[in-house]
A protein has these predicted regions:
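A short, N-terminal "cap"/entry segment at the start of jelly-roll beta-barrel domains
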Residues: 13-73
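Acidic, glycine-rich flexible loop segments
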Residues: 105-125
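Short, conserved beta-strand element in jelly-roll/cupin
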Residues: 73-93, 100-109
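Conserved metal-binding segment of the jelly-roll/cupin
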Residues: 118-138
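A short hydrophobic beta-strand segment most commonly corresponding to one strand
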Residues: 140-152
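His/acidic/aromatic-lined binding-pocket segments of jelly-roll/cupin-type domains
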Residues: 70, 77-80, 116-117, 125
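Sec-dependent N-terminal signal peptides
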Residues: 4-13
Length: 152
């Protein structure tokens, strides 16, 4: 009986995740990307915040059209492509841009982008804070990616 009670006391420890730990399998992320497609907004983008962890937060983004140009004053983006393909335009200036929320600047496009990086599944990129960037898609294409935003 004592052994049974001891085992029962250990049950809550099995599978318990430490604070701040989270795991997403490749199949979890692919399934999540399918749930985002029906939630597209007027800019043909949908996202789901997967967690806030103090200095960083994680989201999955699904796009079926080119995105706005964006720049984050205090956050770096680490992006991993889950599915689809596109091009990341990086650098340059964002004419006509506006601050949309604290530390977030958006605009219609980038002038003078210095990097045009093709993106496909498994690709990973890091974008420093205060760096203009924009996801570009060819008509009929879509892309889903995992983003880790890290406060600098």
């Amino acid at each position: 009986m004592k052994k049974l009670m001891g085992l029962l006391l250990l049950l809550p420890l099995v599978g318990a995740e430490p604070a701040g730990y989270k795991y997403w399998s490749a199949s979890d992320l692919k399934a999540l990307s399918k749930t985002l497609a029906p939630k597209l907004n007027a800019h043909k983008v949908a996202s789901d915040n997967l967690g806030d962890f103090g200095r960083d937060h994680v989201l999955v983004v699904h796009r079926e059209g080119s995105g706005e140009a964006e720049l984050h004053e205090t956050e770096a983006d680490v992006i991993m492509v889950i599915s689809g393909e596109g091009t990341m335009l990086v650098g340059g200036t964002m004419p006509g841009s506006k601050t949309t929320t604290a530390g977030e600047v958006r605009g219609p496009s980038i002038d003078g982008g210095t990097v045009r990086q093709k993106m496909s599944p498994g690709d990973i990129m890091h974008i420093q804070p205060k760096t203009a960037h924009q996801v570009l898609l060819e008509p009929g294409k879509q892309i889903t990616y995992f983003t880790l935003k890290v406060k600098e």
